[in-house]
């Protein structure tokens, strides 16, 4: 089992936010949910030099457990952001 992070981009049309409760409960029932949150404002820092601007197009994340990238992709079913046409970026979180 590997850990993956789903990043929601700020490009979804308006959708019913009430769908999140059902989606997150489904992930929990399947044993896939590892956490998540909306992403607020912040800053980028770099020692000794100016840093780039923050990544503003990321608005939320969910951490999941899945056996493969294909399984992680299948867990997007019912994700309100994805179902509304928004972009979801899936990244594996390597174990070190």
Language-model regions: role of each:
Residues 1-96:
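Conserved, structured core segments of small domains
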